[in-house]
Amino acid sequence: MKTLIARHKAGEHIGICSVCSAHPLVIEAALAFDRNSTRKVLIEATSNQVNQFGGYTGMTPADFREFVFAIANKVGFARERIILGGDHLGPNCWQQENADAAMEKSVELVKAYVRAGFSKIHLDASMSCAGDPIPLAPETVAERAAVLCLAAESVATDCQREQLSYVIGTEVPVPGGEASAIQSVHITQVEDAANTLRTHQKAFIARGLAEALTRVIAIVVQPGVEFDHINIIHYQAQEAQALAQWIEKTKMVYEAHSTDYQTQAAYRELVRDHFAILKVGPALTFALREAVFALAQIEQELIAPENRSGCLAVIEEVMLDEPQYWKKYYRTGFHDSLLDIRYSLSDRIRYYWPHSRIKNSVETMMVNLEGVDIPLGMISQYLPKQFERIQSGELSAIPHQLIMDKIYDVLRAYRYGCAE
């Protein structure tokens, strides 16, 4: 990361896409997409997804590392080219507890990530815990971030410190996505970004972390990009010029969250304006979901009723029976809920892919379709971009490759924005 940031600060148009997903097909796509390039691939886990207690994926940081490396071995991607990052590391998972208890767990969380070899660490202590004022004072946020940084430094080896980098600050909304519809977004003001940096510098120095400050590579701000389940707020470069100019005076870049669904031209503008780390998650699993739904429609027409997977029906049944991952985000009313379950840009389906019933139904669908020749006309109907690539000889009409290429479409837009 440090080399890339140095190149950007030296004037190169270069950025990096941060792949925030634990889905094996998304990680496989991210690695396969850049297998024949010289670029590094940044893959990040969030604190609620992967933590010392397993998170909602059931994986500790060390488990996640081995999970990613196993996929890299399968793809033929050198693990030395993988950068592992931890996102929103702090009290996010334990906000219902008092600050002392939540921070104690947060310290162990950060240590677990660093011990597991994660080299990009987002120190985010912005969440209020039980008994805390809402919002927290910037000084409190910075002091808690310094405690987390101290934890990271205490377990990092000398070799690790050469690669270790920190990201500070946070954006709105908190990790997980918007819980309600959005119409506009508040762009971070320069004075707020400057205050975030100033308070963190003061807190770090007070804890003897002056050297660690040199490892702070980025600050998270809101550049004016956001999405919810039905809306996308697109980047307006002219609105972020004050931020772009301010960061030029520092040794850092910006990290932009929720950049999913922006145009490829917007990604290029964001990188030009020093939002050099672009995070993406739901857009990748949304593309996966689109591919699975398309293949399910193809299966419906090609496979005998008694042998079909019933994939789409299984997904809906499971999500309606177990609504905990979408209920507070989606619209009420049965019809609206169904539309959001299927097509929401927030893509809460991503939490359900590991469910045994859904996983088994998708596997059945894939086996069914691998055993037949999919007519080109059906691929044109349901996956038109992939049809064009089949026609030009770039792609084969194999279900797994069709899913990969659908995910590549998202990665292609980021490559356009980030490429030197």
From Swiss-Prot:
InterPro entries: Aldolase_TIM (IPR013785), GatZ/KbaZ-like (IPR012062), GatZ_KbaZ_carbometab (IPR050303), TagBP_ald_GatZ (IPR023436). The keyword Repeat does not apply. It comes from the Bacteria. Pathway: Carbohydrate metabolism; D-tagatose 6-phosphate degradation; D-glyceraldehyde 3-phosphate and glycerone phosphate from D-tagatose 6-phosphate: step 2/2. Keywords: Galactitol metabolism. GO terms for cellular component: plasma membrane. SUPFAM superfamilies: Aldolase. Gene3D superfamilies: Aldolase class I (3.20.20.70), putative tagatose 6-phosphate kinase domain like (1.10.400.20). GO terms for biological process: D-tagatose 6-phosphate catabolic process; galactitol metabolic process; phosphoenolpyruvate-dependent sugar phosphotransferase system. Forms a complex with GatY. PANTHER family: D-TAGATOSE-1,6-BISPHOSPHATE ALDOLASE SUBUNIT GATZ (PTHR32502:SF12), N-ACETYLGALACTOSAMINE PERMEASE II COMPONENT-RELATED (PTHR32502). Belongs to the GatZ/KbaZ family. GatZ subfamily. Component of the tagatose-1,6-bisphosphate aldolase GatYZ that is required for full activity and stability of the Y subunit. Could have a chaperone-like function for the proper and stable folding of GatY. When expressed alone, GatZ does not show any aldolase activity. Is involved in the catabolism of galactitol. This is D-tagatose-1,6-bisphosphate aldolase subunit GatZ. It comes from Escherichia coli O7:K1 (strain IAI39 / ExPEC). The gene is gatZ.
